[in-house]
């Protein structure tokens, strides 16, 4: 056994990469309370104070502090970088994306036009030399995609029935198992990949075999470059980490290699708390670490995650507002044996929100079960109430599918750590698809014949029997063009923007999932309900085109625990997912879908016309799986019950639900509020629901923040939105108004 593995137990993980087995053999669960936690050290306060000042400067400059224009980002493109002059000794975790804090790298491999536009948007002049290289000599992902797009694909993209496609930015959602760097050292990982290369292709050299051999070689090169990057900071990561500080640093170098080479829409950290706790506990036993020092290590690691930045273009920022990176980091959960996997370090990660205040990043995610230790549930609820910075996902529905060593690879999507990768698929606008079923495929905004020219509804009333066959046909068409478009995008991403650093830390024999998504979900449900249970009259313009709907009579709405509406919701999810499954998916990946919109529900709504449920043209779509605005009439619990009916097995990419609760609705004091929130989550997740964003504040606070963003208390005021967290002052005015328009529950 290597000297770095002293004190560790188990044998199965010694000779092959087996992170789960190592964790199961060595972690100590913790059932106690939060009284052991320590306040920030002097070094933490000083560094975080410097970063807060840099964030103020960044905001004053319009959202970007500094941007690279002359150097193409790579693992070794820069020398060592630190938070400030003379802070090297203060930083217990080192490493920056560039040479300066909050400076955004130049990443042209996804698309040179986008990289240059990101520069010019904020007043920076891109390099003429790099422009020549990436237009004449080096093809990019974006160029490859648009070279191969069919006219139909361009048409659906232009008309926004397929939205947010990863054809102008890195796809993200690939989580390298960064723990491997710490446990095994990079030399061991190189040797394992070299074995895979030797065993690949002993026979016919098919296209797939040739491509895989090239990819493994690229992964080996990435691992070697990872060592060079660490050496720039004075570290040798060839061998395993020797203590907790090294384990955290080694792991961070793995993550840093990813964010230096990719600008994916989600660059998740993964499930690291239990793993790191093993090293911290060993250091405690050896007498080389105190609790204050352990918390400082976690604080400094989280500080680095809070600093991750990418250069983005305006159209991207409209879709994903507030500068998110989805450095998603999970805590808690149960083992396959039913035992709690909560450790002291799970508390420590949540405690960073107290030591350094609220923050959108990392995207802290509690893998929730009603069987988690009471003290941990209470502490998580306490932090949610005070910071609105945590999301919760149901470990009891994910664990049977993904095991007990999975990560969240984006907003809410699970992936088995080190074993799987996901092809990100953005969203199909089913709300617009519904209007196409009525108009015969003609877009209400552009008047293009975007969808198939099926026979429109020609009468003055939308009848259920006339509408449903048309809607089914239109969804079938949309599912087909959606999958084909994504197949093309991911082929080109693999070819021109391959994630070698991340995939080097994932098994070569990787399982791939093919993510799709649904936008406008609740509006489609309520519109079908209106057509079925009420009378929907069509109002036409002078050309006879259906421009508006007038609904007579009442109809059940999703979000009120009414099975008449909720059954339609379940039907819609199952039907669309089954349509997706009919089609061939790239590299034999397994299709999934999500009900998730991010903040792009505002942009999607702009391009969507009037709907039978009463939603006006141009208004934001309801986010994720949330009920339509104004639909919830029976309180929070009824709304949660409706969402809980959606079957997770048909939406393995995730079902996002965001709720805002008035503090007074939870109770009159902290103890009551914590108890009530834990009770709500226990009941919600025991019903099989997948996800919950928890915001605890009143609308008055949002309005005051919008009107007075200069107040110090609002500098890091964080809220949960569909799939992530964001500083409220970083949203556009339009998006702020959208958040304010959503229901803040004043009662259960």
Predicted regions and their residues:
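Conserved catalytic cores of very large enzyme subunits
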Residues: 2-748
């Amino acid at each position: 056994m290597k000297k770095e593995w002293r004190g560790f137990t188990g044998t199965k993980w010694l000779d092959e990469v087996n992170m789960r087995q190592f964790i199961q053999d060595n972690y100590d669960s913790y059932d106690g309370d939060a009284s052991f936690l320590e306040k920030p050290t002097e070094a933490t306060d000083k560094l975080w104070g410097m970063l807060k000042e840099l964030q103020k400067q960044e905001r004053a400059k319009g959202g970007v502090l500094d941007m690279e224009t002359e150097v193409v980002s790579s693992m070794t493109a820069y020398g060592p970088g630190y938070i400030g002059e003379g802070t090297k000794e203060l930083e217990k975790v080192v490493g920056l994306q560039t040479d300066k804090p909050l400076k955004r790298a130049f990443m042209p491999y996804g698309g040179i036009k986008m990289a240059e536009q990101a520069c010019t948007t904020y007043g920076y002049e891109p390099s003429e030399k790099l422009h020549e290289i990436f237009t004449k000599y080096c093809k990019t992902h974006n160029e490859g995609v648009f070279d191969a797009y069919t006219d139909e694909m361009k048409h659906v993209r232009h008309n926004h029935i397929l939205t947010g496609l990863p054809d102008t930015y890195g796809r993200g959602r690939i989580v390298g198992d960064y723990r491997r760097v710490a446990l095994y050292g990079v030399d061991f990982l190189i040797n394992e990949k070299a074995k895979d290369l030797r065993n690949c292709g002993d026979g016919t050299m098919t296209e797939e075999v040739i491509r895989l051999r090239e990819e493994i070689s690229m992964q080996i090169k990435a691992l070697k470059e990872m060592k060079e990057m660490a050496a720039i900071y004075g570290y040798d990561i060839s061998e395993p980490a020797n203590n907790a500080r090294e384990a955290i640093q080694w792991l961070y170098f793995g993550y840093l290699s990813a964010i230096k080479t990719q600008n994916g829409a989600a660059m998740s950290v993964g499930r690291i708390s239990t793993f790191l706790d093993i090293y911290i506990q060993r250091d405690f036993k050896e007498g080389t670490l105190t609790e204050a020092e352990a918390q400082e290590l976690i604080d400094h690691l989280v500080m680095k995650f809070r600093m991750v930045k990418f250069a983005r273009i305006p159209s991207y920022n409209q879709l994903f507002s507030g500068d998110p990176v989805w450095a998603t980091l999970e805590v808690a959960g149960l083992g396959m044996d039913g035992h709690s996997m909560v450790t002291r370090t799970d508390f420590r990660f949540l405690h960073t929100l107290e030591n350094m205040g609220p923050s959108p990043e990392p995207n802290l995610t509690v893998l929730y079960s009603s069987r988690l230790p009471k003290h941990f549930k209470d502490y998580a609820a306490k932090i949610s109430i005070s910071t609105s910075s945590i999301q919760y996902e149901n470990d009891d529905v994910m664990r049977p599918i993904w095991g007990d060593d999975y990560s969240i690879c984006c907003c809410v999507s699970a992936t088995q750590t080190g074993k799987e990768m996901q092809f990100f698929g953005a969203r199909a606008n089913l709300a617009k698809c519904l209007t196409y079923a009525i108009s015969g495929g003609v877009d209400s905004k552009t008047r293009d014949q975007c969808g198939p020219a099926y026979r429109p509804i020609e009468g003055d009333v939308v009848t259920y029997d006339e509408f449903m066959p048309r809607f089914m046909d239109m969804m079938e068409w949309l599912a087909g063009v959606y999958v084909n478009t994504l197949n093309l995008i991911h082929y080109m991403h693999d070819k021109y923007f391959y994630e070698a650093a991340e995939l080097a830390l994932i098994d070569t024999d990787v399982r791939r999932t093919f993510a799709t998504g649904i936008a406008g979900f609740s509006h489609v449900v309520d519109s079908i309900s209106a057509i079925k249970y009420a009378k929907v009259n069509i109002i036409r313009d002078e050309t006879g085109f259906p421009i508006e709907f007038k609904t007579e009579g009442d109809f059940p709405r999703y979000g009120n625990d009414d099975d008449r509406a909720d059954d339609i919701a379940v039907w819609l999810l199952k039907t669309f997912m089954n349509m997706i499954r009919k089609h061939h998916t790239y590299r034999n990946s397994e299709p999934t879908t999500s009900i998730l919109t991010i903040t792009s529900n505002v942009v999607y709504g702009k391009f969507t016309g009037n709907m039978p449920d009463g939603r006006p043209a141009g208004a934001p779509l309801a986010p994720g799986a949330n009920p339509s605005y104004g639909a919830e009439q029976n309180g929070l619990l009824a709304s949660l019950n409706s969402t809980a009916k959606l079957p997770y097995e048909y939406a393995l990419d995730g079902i996002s639900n965001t709720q805002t609760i008035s503090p007074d609705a939870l109770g009159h004091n902290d103890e009551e509020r914590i108890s009530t929130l834990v009770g709500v989550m226990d009941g919600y997740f025991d019903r099989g629901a997948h996800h919950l964003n928890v915001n605890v504040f009143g609308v008055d606070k949002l309005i005051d923040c919008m009107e007075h963003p200069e107040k110090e208390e609002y500098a890091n005021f964080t809220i949960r939105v569909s799939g992530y967290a964001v500083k409220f002052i970083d949203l556009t005015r339009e998006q702020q108004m959208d958040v304010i328009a959503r229901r803040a529950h004043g009662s259960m």
